[in-house]
Amino acid sequence: FLEDDFLPEVKSKFPESEVFLTGYSLAGLFSLWALYESEKFNGAVCCSSSLWFDKWDEYASLHRIKSPSTIYMSLGDREEKTKNKVMSKVGDRTRRQAEILKDDPNVEKLFFEWNEGGHFDEPLKRVAKGITRILG
């Protein structure tokens, strides 16, 4: 739907516009994954992304972003401070993802910021900050 129906409609109305994905949590992971799978996007805002997802590091290490992209990533500074063993990996995985993206030739700009708080603190503000950053 996104590539076959939605994007052609957007491009017909705004032919010169760049297309960025924006996501928080699992949608942040999806936004990043879409850059690895499709050439139709110019970047993504990925806030508090679910990069703890099993085998994500392996996937990201074996793939390249498909087209020149600007990427904004952020994470709350308390998100990795949890007793949940899976969720506690999110900080290391996010730092690792940033390193992978720095080495990707199609990543033209990469922003990575830490925000105060946990996963559920001010998601709208965090997303707005990311959008402002990549469009700024």
How does the language model describe each region?
Residues 1-136:
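Non-catalytic cap/lid and distal C-terminal segments of serine-dependent acyl enzymes
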